[in-house]
Each structure stands twice: as structure tokens, then as C-alpha cells.
Amino acid sequence: MKDLVKFLKAQSKSNDDFDVIKIGLASPDKIRSWSFGEVKKPETINYRTFKPERDGLFCARIFGPVKDYECLCGKYKRLRHRGVICEKCGVEVTQTKVRRDRMGHIELACPVAHIWFLKSLPSRIGLILDMPLRDIERVLYFESYVVTEPGMTDLEKNQLLTEEQFLDAEERWGDEFEAKMGAEGIQALLRDMDLEHQCEMMREELQETNSETKRKKITKRLKLLEAFQQSGNKPEWMVMTVLPVLPPDLRPLVPLDGGRFATSDLNDLYRRVINRNNRLKRLLDLVAPDIIVRNEKRMLQESVDALLDNGRRGRAITGSNKRPLKSLADMIKGKQGRFRQNLLGKRVDYSGRSVITVGPYLHLHQCGLPKKMALELFRPFIYSKLESRGIASTIKAAKKMVEREEPIVWDILAEVIREHPILLNRAPTLHRLGIQAFEPILIEGKAIQLHPLVCAAFNADFDGDQMAVHVPLTLEAQLEARALMMSTNNVLSPASGDPIIVPSQDVVLGLYYMTREKVNAKGEGMYFLDPREAEKAYRTGQAELHARVKVRITEHVKNEAGELVAETKLLDTTIGRAILWMIAPKGMPFKVFNQTLGKKAISKLINESYRRLGLKESVILADQIMYTGFAYAARSGASVGIDDMVIPAQKHEIIRAAEAEVAEIQEQFNSGLVTAGERYNKVIDIWAAANERVAKAMMENLSTEEVINREGNPEKQASFNSIFMMADSGARGSAAQIRQLAGMRGLMARPDGSIIETPITANFREGLNVLQYFISTHGARKGLADTALKTANSGYLTRRLVDVAQDLVITEDDCGTHEGIVMTPLIEGGDVKEALRDRVLGRVVAEDVLKPGTEEVLIPRNTLIDEKWCDVIDAESVDVIKVRSVVTCNTDFGVCAKCYGRDLARGHLINQGEAVGVIAAQSIGEPGTQLTMRTFHIGGAASAAAKESSIQVKNAGTIKLTNAKFVTNKEGKIVLTSRNTELTVIDTFGRTKENYKVPYGAVLSKNDGAEVAVGEVVANWDPHTMPVISEVSGRIQFSDIVDGLTVTRQTDELTGLSSIVVQDVGERATAGKDLRPALRLVDAQGNDILIPSTDVAAQYFLPGKAIVTLDDGAEIEVGEALARIPQESVGTKDITGGLPRVADLFEARKPKEPAILAEISGIVSFGKETKGKRRLVITPAEGEAFEEMIPKWRQLNVFEGEMVQRGDVISDGAETPHDILRLRGVHAVTDYIVNEVQEVYRLQGVKINDKHIEVIVRQMLRKAVITNAYDSEFLEGEQVEVSRVKIANRKRAEEGKPLVEFERELLGITKASLATESFISAASFQETTRVLTEAAVAGKRDELRGLKENVIVGRLIPAGTGFAYHQNRAKKRNQQEQAVAFEAPVEKLTGSQPMLISKRNSNSLQTMQLKA
């Protein structure tokens, strides 16, 4: 018996104590050592006895017994014969489960190339032999010979010979040389490789070569050769002579009812290989003719290819049902593959799912669980209780009792469930709040009851949603569920730090109704002793809920010592607000409750409560608010009736006026005063404005009503119209929706996104006519199609983000860096988009913040800025703070807590072990489904942005112009001639108040440094056309303006004026293609006039569609328009918005026509032009001049002789993040990506903290390219993890060697995920085959640092509660290593076990051999 216990213990304790996994190529000997015997026959099982055939694919002698402890012939049965090998059938008596891990092998009659190393690009075999893939394939598939040993002939090694050439050579030289065909030839070449010699040659070549492409090629090959050298892999192992056979239980053969069998496709593929192999052996024994043998060898190669990766080469082999067979490669890749289906997405026991419904009477930490479900989920617990109480004698009896549902069982269930948390999950789980823990309350019925306040976190509604229930079993699991996942511990959103437990819909409406004021309501002016008395008056009908009254209120306020002190005052309020005050916790001020509470105000209230009083009080408050809200929503009786949609009286007048304006524009168009594009734009502007006016009239009408007050005078008050109240409170609906119900529907879009110029003037209350209805259907259908696309795209974005950031964990408290990023308030136009306090809240200060204008330290370095500090920042009006950021954090693998700052979901400095990468990915991905797919929101956003034509300042101050170049026209006004000018308004302290972009050709009334008053208009321009401004006075001379070739002349019939329109290059005849229409300015003598302070002639090239109204030879003054270019339809070009834009930014994609940035700082000049390009030269103060060719059609922002700084914009366009990183550095690129991503989310009203985006940027920047390697282990031009270079440089600094030089590189998230150090993580993401091939050849080691790798090998993740476990292991390992270092360093390699993965304990290394 003792033996048995020992044996079972030994069985369960497999050696999973490893810290590294290594992957490599398997040598033939290795494969034979795993194997338990050779598979010689293609047979599987005997059709009569169903026993496995001997030496077949399911042979019991090779793979182990079919029944536990029983040999095949039945001679030995039972446990006592354990380990005996039966002499009759040769089967070892042991457990059946060995059939899951015992492998076999096939001895191949001729070598076969492994398709992964051949066809997975770049071909590893091709790279190492330095032969093109086509040639290698010709050799492998027996079309050509390859010379393996040239001997004394004039053939070369690796040369290909056709059949004829081979025969000729044989006649000529006899057996002086050797040439082979098929995999043997390739194997021979690989075996003869002298890796060291090759490496040396490559290094020499690298020194000598100058061409960039050659360098790249050599570096690639050198890296591969070095990888082979270091990993101990041999190149000839890429060609197999032995094929491993998978254990039979991993490719099962299952009998179905009806005598048929279901089999794994692998068995078919193996059968093919064995059949062909056996046939080839026979042919070789018979010495068959060459051509037959060759054909058989080729077929063998093809069948092995199909087994390893079906469909990689040629047509995929199909089964009986015409569908391709699933090969070994297909088993592991893709969504259904081993990685994603079984290792990362396992099914869970003790779980159930059901429909959810509302539980308005629950507490926040509770959920209603149907009794039936609970009984099933908690079965084992009930059995054990029944048994331990002696109610049931055995487990079987207990089971019977539970099945009969005896009354005692329910009592025990209630006891078991008490304080045992359960997890609820709603798919899709887009962020961590999609799984939360609750205490179950047993209920009748079959639906799970959910607390209404957590619906926002789960994104749940009750229209048939289902949720899954999971039971945490172990004590640790229950503890984590209670301490970390309980719904009461997740009040704040991890994305923004705002409360996510906020009331919505009914509750908001109830509270809003309850806290509204009404003029002259019953009971107005009464006085009450306390809120209870006020409530009594309301309940007895003495006073209305909305009556303005005076109530004595007792507030509890904190004094200096931080104790709560009661203060009682008589305050003006309403009865409803006084009643609501009764649920307020001590320590909250009354002013928060004494207002009309909309959704935003309630959110603020809960936030305030959380910051002031902590978690417990806030949770109780949230619950109370919910109960009160529901009660008063029911009392309010708010409902929607058709008469609530009041149509404004002015509507018809507004529409008539708009129609008249449109008719006028149409007249102008007919008489040729405006172009078609301008007409279209103006029409759309007119209708957009009309729509706004109707909406405004309607909202004024709806939102206020006139009533008679107590004095008998009329007074305006907010309306009690139900529709208005719902929208105003934020319960449901919005102004935009009310506009469609009671205003006019407005402009609609065609399916391609362009705007139809006839708007829908009707609204839903009036009803649409057929045409209007038809136009509406476009939008509705597009909306549905978009939603479907959006969900998939958003999910994929989230997956890529999680993958790139998954291994980022807080690993230390402080990395000690002084670096950081500079934060200023975000100002766009006249509004502050985001105040400084909101941007720095929860960050750690990187440098002391000084009081403005003094040397006094206001906030010391390394302070975490909380709400109190924010008030200080506001009070002292600080406008720039340097904060620490994850992008500049110095921690090697991970981030430090100080650089990350506050844990947004908890409100304190983040803890070590927090998986910030995953949280960041979820926070960015989760709102993804709310972002539009459409290029932009139709009508609203597009036309409003395009209509601006002047700048009116909102604050007094001083004007500052940046990047401005201008001329002064004859009226003395300033006309801008620069393209990206910014106009800033600065107050007396030098703080930026407003910030505007001013277009080219704008007329400014104020110069740089001038004072402005509030409301002054400082700039104006024509929004529909862009002028070409003359910078000198003179006479116009046409150049290359040829009627009918480059321009067309248009004459206006009414006015007789003629204008010239330049044709697009694409539309011109061939003769006009190379002509460049331009206007030159000349003096009286006909000489070119130079642009002031340069030696460049004033000539202006005209782009296509430009319109010139001046004649040749006309006189012109400075600052006048020479021509105008119509701005095409309202900014529909290239506004990628919403989700695609975010994806583009994170993928770091290069835009189509990127901005051209200055590569160095210096003076601009123009060199010799070529046909289609001009030469731009930048000459620095010292050093080499830099030149580049720029296409002539690009508009330049710089003039001859101008000074530019490195990274300045030379030609407009979308900026490329790669350029920004190269020219302006890491901070600039971080700013760019963070601001651009935030721009998209802000437009949708989604709040995400900057630091989440910074976390992703850090991961995008984690690679560097080596620019100067010196004598380090790196190669020049190699891509390496930044942390590895930093570690190497620290070591070099200690040794006094020069530091390795490198440049940071920006990778898109997909690329960055695939370029991660961990091959397991990369393989489970995308392109599994390629990643594994690359890793195997290089003999990569996976240090198991990230989360994914650890989930895949089945361990606790190194984050959260698993963080400490991993740290302790590392500590132990270090202690052991130090102890070992004192002993003699003898290390013996144990023989590897017969498993796919061989593991080694001596230095805790695990090797995964990848052959099949």
C-alpha cells in the first residue's frame, strides 16, 4: 500500500519547475530518443476486433496499452503486474494515459526537407545556402541537379545542372565531381557548411560594401549564421531523415454509432507518408529505374509537406469530403488553433448562464441567483455539508437527496451560499469591469437579477442579455473575488478615474424631477424645522415637491483638526432637495444637493463623496440615491406624448428664407459668378445654418415656459415638458434627437458620405413624404452596416493593443529618473479643451514646480498630485508642469510606480504588480465600439468646422504670431503669406489663453505684440476659396498659360467678364502635360521682380482648378490676390475619423502625402530644378549641406533664405510619426500620438486618461536600431529591445568601454507584438508558423516575463497576486545560483524524457523541440 501512495505521488509530481523555455531544431538522434518504436505499417485498428494493429499507427506495443494496467492479449491484468512487458504481445502493463505522451517515429527512406524552413519567408534554407528559393525547389522536386563537390572540374559548388548538362559533365569529367538531386543534395550542401568560416567572410564583406541593400542582405544572413552557431542547431537538421509520430491519443480514432469511425486528419496524412515511404523502400531494394524512384521520392516529399503544413506548397490535399485536411501547422495556428482555443481560452467548470433582469431592491454588492442554478453550482459544497452533518451517510445518498430537492437541502444551500461571492460576466468582456463579484441572494424564477447601477460597467440592458456565473472555489479565489473584484470595490473607472457606478435613465429622471424648482408652487415660502418636517408636508399634500421653501439644515463639516463638526443653518431650498438631503452621509456639503441634479451633477456628487468620505459611504450613498430616484421617477409620472413635441412657429419662415437664399446662389451659378463646387458648399452652409436656427427656436420654445409668480408678474422658468426633462437631465435622448422630432431632420448623406444638398425640412411629428422617407433610408441602413463592421474592427483593435502591452507590469517603486514630459493646458481656439489640473491629476511631478514669477518651490519633486494640489495649481495659476511619464521611465522590464502615478480605479499611488499594460489596452479598446466608422458625423461636424471665416477673441491680452510671414497691403492691413501660422492670445502673466490656426491669405487687423480687447475681430478670410497673394507690386506676365492646352477661358454671359481656369494635369492633352502655368511679376522693363530679402524671382505656379480674373500685363499691388483656388466640397477629403484613425495612429502608418520636414537646421535655398521636381538645399551653420528633391506640385511653406529648425514643416500634409521621432525626439512623438488619439475620443465625448495612451506608445518605442556597435554583441542596423542595449551600456560603462549608440524606432502595434522577445507570446498572436520557424532556427529562449506566456504554460501570471509568487521564485533562484557558484561547477545533462517538450531541472531550462 505504501508503494502505491509513493507511486501516485511520484506520478502527480511532474517537473514543471522551470523558468525558461527554449525552442530548437530536433536532430534525428533526438527524435529517435523520444520514440518508443518505429511505425512501419499504415494500418490503424483491426476492423473485426477493433484492437490496434501491431507496428501500425495505433500500435499498443509502441504507444502503450489501450486499457489501464492490461496488456493487449489479456495475459496480464491488474495493478500487481505493473511495469511488466508481456512476452506474447510486447505491451507494457501501465496506465492508458501514456498513449498521450509516448511518441513513435518513421525512418524515412530518403531525406525530406522541412517545408517550414523552406517556404516560410524568408526561406531559411535559401538564406543559409545563399541560393534563390526557386533553385532550391527545382532541386528538391527533382527538376535539376545541384553540384555538391566540384572536385577539379570547372563547375562551381551550389551550381544547378539540368539533366542534359549533368550527362554532358559526366561524360566529360566522369566521377571527378559530385552532383545530387532532391533533398539529399540540399542536405549535403547544408552538412558541408563551415559556419565559422562563412561568418568571418560575411563580416569582411560587410566592412567593404557600400550599397545599402547589400548591407541589409549580408546582415540578415550573418544574423542567421550566428544564430545557428550560438544555438547549437545544425543546418542539416532542417532536412529530416526521421519523422516523429504524434502520440495516438492526440490524433484519436473514435467509433461512432452505426459502425463508422471519426478520425483525426493527421491519421490520413501519416498513412500517406507511411505508404509512400514503404513503397520507396521496396523500389530501392528492387533497384528500380531512376525515373520511378525519383517520382516516388518526390511524392514522399510532398506527403511530408502536407503532414507538416498542408496547402503551403501546391494544392492542399483533400479528404473524402473535398475539404483540405488539417495538418500539424493548422492545429496550432488561428483562432481555432491550439494557442488561442485551448491555451488562452479555456472553458471553466462550476459555471452557468441565464437571462438577466432588474433587481432594483438589491444592494450594490448583491445579485439575485435563481435557486435552481445555485443548487447545481454549489453541489459539492452541499454534499460535503450533508455528509459532515450526518444527514446523508454517503456522497451517493447526498446526491439522491439533492436530486429529490428535499427541504433540508434548501436550508443547507442558503448556509453554503452565505458570504460566498460569485463572479458575473457579460460577454463581450471589453474591460476588467466586465467581470465582477457579487454576493448571491437566492430567488425564485430562472433569471439572474442584476443591480441597476452596475449596468454601465457591464454595458448591460435588459432586452434579453445573458450573463455567465462562475464560482470561485478555493479560499484564495474567494478572497480575491471579495477584496479586488467585488462590485463595491470598483466604483471608479480604470480608464478615466471618474465614477462608473452612476445612475442612468429612470434614476436620473427621478432625481432631476425631485430637485427642480417651480415658481408659485403650493407651499412656496414656508419654513421648516428640518427635512423630516418638509417631507411630512409633502406627504400630507400641504406643499408641492418643487416649492421654494426655507429649511433648517444640519451640515457636518471638517474643522482644522479633521473632525466632523455640526453646523446648522436656515437655507433656501426646495422640498424635494430637503428630502434628498436626508440620505446624504455626514461630511457632505449641502450645496452639492441644493441644485437641479442632472446626470453630470450626480456623477460629480458621487465623485465628491468618494474623495471626501471614502468607499464605504459612497457605496451606501449610491444605493440610497438609486432607491430614491426610482421612487420619485414613479411619482413624477413623466411620459412621452405627441403633444410634447412642440414645433416652433418660426420654422416655416426660416425655411422660406433659406430657400430664397439658395435660389439666389443658383442664379449666381447660372450666370457663372460662382463655380459648381462653391455653389454646393454655400447651399450646404445655408441649410446647416437654417437647421441650427430652427433647432434654436425649438429648444427655446421647449425649454422655457412663462408662468405667473406670487406677485402676479410673469416669470420665465425651465419647462416641465417630459421630453425636455428627459433630455435636459441626461436620462435619455439628446437635443439632436429632439431636433429631429420637433425641428427639421436637416441634411442627409449619401451612402458614400457626401451630403445631399436638398435637406429634409419635415420632422417626425409632421411626418416625412415619400421622397424624404427614401432619403432617410440611406442613413438608417448605413448605420446598421457600420455598427456590424465597427464591432469587429473595434474587437480586433483591442486584441492588438492587449497583445502589444500585455507584458507591461509595475515592477518597482521608483526608477529614479529626472526625465518627464511637459504638460500645459490644451487650448484650441478660444476654449480650454482640457485644463492643466485635469491633465496632471494623479501624476507625479518630475521637477520642483516653482510659484510663477518667483524661486519659491510650490510643489516638490516626486509629489503625487491629488485634488488638493490641483486646487493649489488653480489658485497660483501655474500653467506648465513637468510630470513623470511611462514613456520616459527607466525601469528595464516593466514600469515604476512613480512614473505611472495614481491607480485611476483606486485613487492612490499604483501598487507593484498591477498589469498597467492590459488596463491601458482595455481603456482604449472598450470605447472603440462607440467611435464612428463613418469618415465623419454627417452634416453636423463637417459643415460647422468649415464655416469659420474670422477670429473673434474672447479674452483681452496680447497677440503672439508664430510661424508668420506676411505682407502689408495698400490699406495698411496685414496679409498672411505663410501656411501654418498660429495666433495666440497671452494674458499679463504670459499664460496662453486662446490659440487659433490662421489660414494663408487671411487679413489680420493686429500685428504681433498688439493689445486686443474682448470680442475684437483680429482676422478674417474667405472660407470657400484660397487666394494666391502677391508679395510684390508689379505687372503680371503669363507664363505657360496657353488657351486650350493648360487653361480654359470662361466668359460670363451677363457681365461679359472672362476668367481663366487652369486645367488639372490629368485632364490636359499630352502637349500640355509638361507645361507649368504660372504668373510672373515684372517691372516696367520686363525684368523679373525679386521677392524682398531673397534672390528668388516672384513667380506663382498655379495648381489645377485655379481661377485667374486678371489679364496679361495688368498692374497689381502688394497683398492683392492674383488668383483664387476654390476649396473643394466641405472638408470631406481625408478626414479619417473615429476608429480607423485610432488604428492608423497606433499602427504608425505613413499617410499618403506626408508633410515634408526639415532634416537639419539651417538656411533654405533652391538648387537646380529637374523636370518634375525642385531641389531643396538646407545649409547649416557648420557641416554638410542637406539636399532633397521635392515634387513641384507640393506647396512649400519656406522661401529662399529662410532659417528653419530641424523638424520644421517644409511642405504641408499629414505628419508621419516616424519623422517626428527621428527629427524631434521621443517627447514630440508621444505628444503627437496622445493628442491625436485624444482628439478622436474627445469628439465622441469619451474620457480616457493620457497615461493609457502613453503606455501603448512606450510599447511602440521599445525597439532601437543600433547605429554604432563598437565591439559589442550587437550588429549595426540590428533591431534590439531598448532595455537590452541599456543593460549592455551600463555594463560597458563600468568596464570603461565606449557606449553602444542607437536610435529609437517606432513600430506599429502589430509589428511590435510580433517583434516581442517572447516567441510564445508572438506565436499566439499572429503568423504562428513564421514566428516559430524563426525562433526554432535561432534557438530562442523565452524568459516567460509577460502574462500571455505564463498563461500558456499554465502558471500564475507575474501580475497582481501572482507578482509576489514570481518574485519569491526569482529570489530563491538567485540564492540557489549563488550557493551553486561556491561548489564545483559540474553540470550533467540528464537524458530527456520521451515528450514533445523536454525539460531540464539542473538550470531550470525547458527545451521545446520543433520538428513536426
Swiss-Prot record:
Annotated residues for binding of Zn(2+) 1: C71, C73, C86, C89
Q: What's the top EC group for this one?
A: transferase
Which reaction(s) are listed as its catalytic activity?
RNA(n) + a ribonucleoside 5'-triphosphate = RNA(n+1) + diphosphate
Identify the SUPFAM superfamilies for this entry. Answer: beta and beta-prime subunits of DNA dependent RNA-polymerase (SSF64484)
- SMART domains this protein is in? RPOLA_N (SM00663)
GO MF entry, a single one: magnesium ion binding
Protein name stated in the entry: DNA-directed RNA polymerase subunit beta'
Species classification: Bacteria, Pseudomonadati, Pseudomonadota, Gammaproteobacteria, Pasteurellales
